[in-house]
Each structure stands twice: as C-alpha cells, then as structure tokens.
Amino acid sequence: MNTVNIRPLPGERRVNYSAGWFVPVDEVTGMPPALPLRVFLDIHDGQGWVPTGIEPAITLSGAITYPGLGRCHNPAAAAPTRYRARFESEAYLAVGRAHQDGEEFLAYPFDGTTPPAVAASRVTVSLAPAVGYPFPGHLPVLYGQVSTAAGEPVPDVLVSATVGPPVLRTPQTAQTLTGPGGAFALPLRWAPAGPAITVTATDYRHVPNRTGQLSVQLPGALGRNQQIVIR
C-alpha cells in the first residue's frame, strides 16, 4: 500500500493513501525524465472527463502521486471515483497515448481508520522522445511523418522497428509516438549500417487499426524526412 504522511498536527499522525502511483521513465536514457513534464488530473463525471486542477505530489524517487483522493467521512457508503492522469511535454510523448489520452485509475474511499479496498498499483509511464527531444549527437535518429493516403497527418501513432537474427543475436525494438502534427523521431542506437530495417506505424485509436510500413537503410535514411502512409 502506498502511503504519504502530510502535515500532521502536533502530537498526531495523519496517514493518506495515494490512489495513483506513476513512475515516468525516459525511454532514451532509461532514467526519470530530466526535461519538463506536466501532469494533468481529470475526473469522470458520468458524462465525460473534466479537469480537476489538482496538482500531484512528487516523491523523492520521482514518482507522481495523488495522496488524499478518495478520503471521505463514510467510506462504506461511498463508491470509487474514476480519474485519469495525462502526461504532456515538449520533449516527451507518453507511449500510452497510442491507446488512450491518459492513465485511468480508481480512487477507492477511505478515512482515518478504514483503508482503501484496493491498494494503488505502481504504473510505469514510458516517455518516448518527441521531435523536440535533445538527442545526443552520437545517437542515430530517424525522423519522419505519418499520414493517411489523403495526406492528413495522424497523431498518437505508434512507430516501431525491430531487428533480430541474423542481423542481431538478441532482438531489439525501438519505439516512439507521433506528435500532434504526425511527426516522429525514432532513435535507433542498435541499428546496424547496411541491412534493411522495417519501420512500422500502427494507429491503434482507429477502428479498425490502420498500419503502414517503410523499409530504410542506415546511415542514408537518417538525413531525410521519411514518410509513412497508413491505411
């Protein structure tokens, strides 16, 4: 159970439970994000999502939490509340956006003596690099755009490339997401020069899913803006 102690009165100890527990990870570095990341919390009012304006608490390890969500006077008579955390940044794109706008979770009712019926689960939020990410100079990055056959740019499309045997003994996969204008930046740190690499774009938000592929070779493909059409 994730707990956070906040401002107890003298001689008292007040325990709060965190309904949300998110650990953001920069997929380029494998570390907590070093660049600015904004988090917005929405509540579902039965009709749709409404911004709450509630700011998260950040733990010493960099986890994003929402202590106090679900606290009420009579937990036995209260129902869980549905929330959603959205992650936005100029440098990052939350990979989960390939499927939905944010990470949804339930805040179960609790008070000072009754804990939530269900403990919060730790959720890793993978942050793929956006086009504006400051990549190190030695890292090969494939830039491009995903669009429909009609030329309309498509945001929130998962772009990935996998290379395995016989080129690489252990299969490696790189992934990123398209931004609002359909543009993407796909880092390929393990990709060898010469062999063809297949880059796949998948729009999971469209029903049915739309996909497109592109075959590239390094290093020649790095100096061009690649175009992937999904159908």
Ranges and model annotations:
Residues P155-R231:
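Structured core of small recognition/catalytic domains
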Residues A91-V123, D203-Q227:
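Structured interaction patches on ligand/partner-binding surfaces of diverse proteins
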Residues I43-R71, V167-L186:
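Short, acidic Ser/Thr/Gly-rich low-complexity loop/linker segments typical of extracellular
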Residues T29-Q47, A149-V167:
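Short, ordered, surface-exposed loop/turn motifs in non-cytosolic proteins
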Residues M1-P33, D111-V141, Q145-E152, A221-R231:
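Beta-strand-rich domain onsets/edges
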Residues A19, P36-R38, R82, V141, ...:
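Exposed beta-strand and adjacent loop surfaces of beta-rich binding modules
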Residues P75-G96, A193-H206:
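A short, solvent-exposed beta-strand micro-motif common in secreted/extracellular proteins
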Residues R13-V15, A76-P80, F135-G137, L177-G179, ...:
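Surface-exposed coil/turn segments at beta-strand junctions on protein surfaces, enriched
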